[in-house]
Structure formats: C-alpha cells, structure tokens
C-alpha cells in the first residue's frame, strides 16, 4: 500500500489512498471539489521510499473535499485572583474534511488509487396500513 507525506496548513500528514483526513481549512473551496497537494515531502510503499529535499518535484496527491466545518468550542478562561477580574473567551477552529483519491509519483504514474465512493440511495418501501373501522 502506497503512502505519501504531504504538507498543508503548516502541518505534515501521512496519507494513503481512500483515507479521510481532517486538515486546516482550505480557503476558497466548496464541497464536492477536487484538490491537488503539490507539497509532497516523501512517498513510497513497503519496499521503496522517495524523499525530497525539501519536496519531491512532480509528485502530487489528489483529494476530494467532503465538507468544511468547525471543531467544538475550546474555552479560554483567565482569572486574576482577589481582584474580581476574569475573562472568558471561546474559539472554534475551522477545518476541511478531505478524502484522498490518488497518489502520483514524480513521473506522473498513479501509485495508488482509492475505490470509487458510491453514495448510498435510500430505498423506500411502500408500507400499507389497515385502518380499523368501528
């Protein structure tokens, strides 16, 4: 199974095809769009590894944006004792949820590809009810 180490949002992630990942929010991106990551620090599989200095030129990772959202609230509470001085603040960090679809090598060959994601459709069965009459 191939993997790649990508850099986005000031952080580094080890990704595999088909994996769902929560990363820092990507600007100007709408759900159901394709995203390309070109800052690939390394990629490889069980046998070989290709390490860049600092990035591997020509390698890329394609992903699908699943959704944009906000994490849960983190409370910041500051208090100065015996002075009746306190401050309460909250913060919700924004994130993007992505699904890795393809990993490309520096030659442009596809190293690994995720299976097609089929959206489940709701199957509605007709239910008949009998009304009791008096």
From Swiss-Prot:
Pfam families tied to this protein: Ribosomal_L21p
Source organism superkingdom: Bacteria
Q: Which UniProt keywords apply?
A: Ribonucleoprotein, Ribosomal protein, RNA-binding, rRNA-binding
Single Gene Ontology MF annotation: rRNA binding
Q: Which GO terms describe its biological process?
A: translation
Q: Which GO terms describe its cellular component?
A: cytoplasm; ribonucleoprotein complex; ribosome
Q: Tell me the protein family, please.
A: Belongs to the bacterial ribosomal protein bL21 family.
Subunit composition and interactions: Part of the 50S ribosomal subunit. Contacts protein L20.
Function of the molecule? This protein binds to 23S rRNA in the presence of protein L20.
Name of the protein described by the UniProt record: Large ribosomal subunit protein bL21
Q: Which organism is it from?
A: Pelagibacter ubique (strain HTCC1062)
